[in-house]
Amino acid sequence: AIEEDMKKNNGLITMEDLANFRAEVKNPLSVKYRDFEVFGPTAPCGSWTTLETLNILENFDTKSMGHNSPEYLHMFVEAARHAFADRYHYLGDPDFVDVPLSGLLSKEYAKDVSQQINKNYAELENSYEGDPWNHYSDIEIHDPWKYESRNPNAKLKNGDYDQNSDCTTHFSTADKNGNLVSCTQTAVGHFGSKVVSKGLGILWNNGMVW
């Protein structure tokens, strides 16, 4: 059915592509956050952004700030901003580009980054104009390589892409019993190609970013 869809709609995926694809089973990433051990899939998935955020937050006494207090929310947002600045610059497939995962997830690195956070006001968003993913893809504001035991083979370079493209659709839903579902789909353009495979219900994307 997939091959038929591709042929009918001038798609790029062939039966040979499907036959040659192999799923890779890899060890998950993990960090210790206070009394918890938190796991996430390794790169090119972006879970290390969350793990880095937790590592940064661990350097602050968030419990004393109070749940969802202005002080707590400020520290969380600032930690996430720093982690996402790294994500926009370093996220990639380790099979094709060097990603300093050990450095990004080291406790020493997180402590270094935490010392750059101002407790009184936001700083990162005031330093540039435009979208953060465009800005930080070109500029590294931290150096996780200092916390790696190796040197980079090749650093990520910003490629050609549509500066105004939107590539991720997200929705959350809940029922009366408190069951929650959070879904994020990256299909490049808004809803990808806007074509759904007849009978399969697959929404085809319109690009191969990662």
Question: Would you name each region that the model predicts?
Answer:
Residues 30-32, 37-40, 49, 172-173, ...:
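Structural recognition of the beta-strand scaffold that forms the well-ordered cores
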Residues 26, 33, 48, 166, ...:
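Short, solvent-exposed loop/turn segments at the edges of secondary structure
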Residues 1-39, 43:
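Long, well-ordered, tryptophan-enriched scaffold segments
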Residues 11, 60-186, 199-200:
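Internal maturation/activation junctions in enzymes
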Residues 39-47, 168-172, 184-196:
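Glycine-rich phosphate/pyrophosphate-binding beta-alpha loops
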Residues 190-205, 209:
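A short, polar/charged loop-to-alpha-helix boundary motif
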